[in-house]
Every structure is written in structure tokens, then in C-alpha cells.
């Protein structure tokens, strides 16, 4: 992967947390091209399948929207079965020549499950119910794990505080935070 492509994939932070039967997924709003900020309030989350599933993306916007559209089609085809839809999307992503070139990652949550669909078509289900993608993901992930283990904050509050921490550290992440809940 070339340096410019890495910047496209890594230039945001998306974080999802499941706690006490509720899930929250949020992102910052910064859109960058290379080292230039183009927009401060980009929406990188989307509700899917009758509002029961929340997905967020990191990567090239057009590629991510294409993948989200395909994922939504898979959800409809498999009656909202998250894991089956994710595996089928990943299979298509790996085998379809057009999709294989898309540069994006998806983070997906329901009230019970959290998944990451990687740019290589892998489906990853974290053990702790926390999904994080993008350039500030490791900062947000570390903060979320600590807050989940040592506080009684809600999923939404954990996402908000963790994204604020990531925004303080990562130059590709800002503090214009949008959070969705299920």
C-alpha cells in the first residue's frame, strides 16, 4: 500500500462500544486529504436495517459508501442477520475485482454484537465488544477499554470520552463528535 493510500484509510476515528445491552458508535467529523483538512463536520456513521444496526467507516468516502450500500443489501438479503451479511460482504470483497480495490474499513454494532470488516475482507469480532478503526483508533480503543473496566459510564459516554481523548492526540481526528445509539 502506498503512503497516500494509508492516509486515506487512517484519516479518521470511529469507535463503537457495547455495554449493558446498549451500543453506541461514534466518529469524529474531520475529512482530510493527505495532510489537508477539507471539512470539520463529515458524518461517518449510518443506521442500517430498520435502525437496528449502526455502521461507521474509515477510508475513502466513495469506497466506504459503496461498501455500506453493499452491506445494506446483504442485510436485507439475510433478514438482518449481521454475521451472515458481514461474511457474505467479506467474501464478495475478496473475490470481486472491483470491490477488491476499495480502500475502506467498516465498524458495525448492534446492541449485542460488534464487528470490524477490514480492508482485506476479514470479519473480526472483538472479545470485549469494542470496535475501533481509523488513525486515532488505538488511542480511542485504549481509552474505551479503561473506561469500560473502571467506570460505570454508559456506552455513549465511553464513546464520547474516548473520542475526545483520541482527538487530543491524533492530528487526523477532531472533536466534532457524532454518536448513534441502539
From Swiss-Prot:
<dbReference type="GO" id="GO:0009376">
    <property type="term" value="C:HslUV protease complex"/>
</dbReference>
<keyword id="KW-0021">Allosteric enzyme</keyword>
<comment type="subunit">
    <text>A double ring-shaped homohexamer of HslV is capped on each side by a ring-shaped HslU homohexamer. The assembly of the HslU/HslV complex is dependent on binding of ATP.</text>
</comment>
<dbReference type="GO" id="GO:0046872">
    <property type="term" value="F:metal ion binding"/>
</dbReference>
<feature type="binding site">
    <location>
        <position position="173"/>
    </location>
    <ligand>
        <name>Na(+)</name>
    </ligand>
</feature>
<dbReference type="GO" id="GO:0005839">
    <property type="term" value="C:proteasome core complex"/>
</dbReference>
<dbReference type="InterPro" id="IPR029055">
    <property type="entry name" value="Ntn_hydrolases_N"/>
</dbReference>
<protein>
    <recommendedName>
        <fullName>ATP-dependent protease subunit HslV</fullName>
        <ecNumber>3.4.25.2</ecNumber>
    </recommendedName>
</protein>
<keyword id="KW-0479">Metal-binding</keyword>
<comment type="function">
    <text>Protease subunit of a proteasome-like degradation complex believed to be a general protein degrading machinery.</text>
</comment>
<dbReference type="GO" id="GO:0051603">
    <property type="term" value="P:proteolysis involved in protein catabolic process"/>
</dbReference>
<dbReference type="InterPro" id="IPR001353">
    <property type="entry name" value="Proteasome_sua/b"/>
</dbReference>
<dbReference type="Pfam" id="PF00227">
    <property type="entry name" value="Proteasome"/>
</dbReference>
<keyword id="KW-0888">Threonine protease</keyword>
<feature type="binding site">
    <location>
        <position position="167"/>
    </location>
    <ligand>
        <name>Na(+)</name>
    </ligand>
</feature>
<dbReference type="GO" id="GO:0004298">
    <property type="term" value="F:threonine-type endopeptidase activity"/>
</dbReference>
<dbReference type="InterPro" id="IPR023333">
    <property type="entry name" value="Proteasome_suB-type"/>
</dbReference>
<keyword id="KW-0645">Protease</keyword>
<comment type="similarity">
    <text>Belongs to the peptidase T1B family. HslV subfamily.</text>
</comment>
<keyword id="KW-0915">Sodium</keyword>
<feature type="binding site">
    <location>
        <position position="170"/>
    </location>
    <ligand>
        <name>Na(+)</name>
    </ligand>
</feature>
<keyword id="KW-0963">Cytoplasm</keyword>
<keyword id="KW-0378">Hydrolase</keyword>
<dbReference type="InterPro" id="IPR022281">
    <property type="entry name" value="ATP-dep_Prtase_HsIV_su"/>
</dbReference>
<feature type="active site">
    <location>
        <position position="12"/>
    </location>
</feature>
Amino acid at each position: 500500500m502506498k503512503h497516500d493510500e494509508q492516509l486515506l484509510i487512517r484519516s479518521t476515528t470511529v469507535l463503537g462500544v457495547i455495554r449493558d445491552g446498549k451500543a453506541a458508535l461514534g466518529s469524529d467529523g474531520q475529512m482530510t486529504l493527505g495532510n489537508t483538512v477539507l471539512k470539520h463536520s463529515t458524518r461517518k456513521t449510518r443506521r442500517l436495517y430498520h435502525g437496528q444496526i449502526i455502521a461507521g467507516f474509515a477510508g475513502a468516502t466513495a469506497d466506504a459508501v459503496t461498501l455500506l450500500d453493499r452491506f445494506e443489501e446483504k442485510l436485507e438479503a439475510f433478514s438482518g442477520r449481521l454475521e451472515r451479511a458481514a461474511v457474505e460482504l467479506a467474501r464478495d470483497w475478496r473475490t470481486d475485482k472491483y470491490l477488491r480495490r476499495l480502500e475502506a474499513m467498516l465498524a458495525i454494532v448492534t446492541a449485542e454484537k460488534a464487528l470490524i470488516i477490514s480492508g482485506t475482507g476479514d470479519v473480526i469480532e472483538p472479545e470485549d465488544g469494542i470496535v475501533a478503526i481509523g488513525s486515532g483508533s488505538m488511542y480511542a480503543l485504549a481509552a474505551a477499554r479503561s473506561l469500560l473496566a473502571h467506570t460505570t459510564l454508559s456506552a455513549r459516554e465511553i464513546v464520547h470520552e474516548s473520542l475526545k481523548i483520541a482527538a487530543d492526540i491524533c492530528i487526523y481526528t477532531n472533536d466534532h463528535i457524532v454518536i448513534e445509539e441502539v
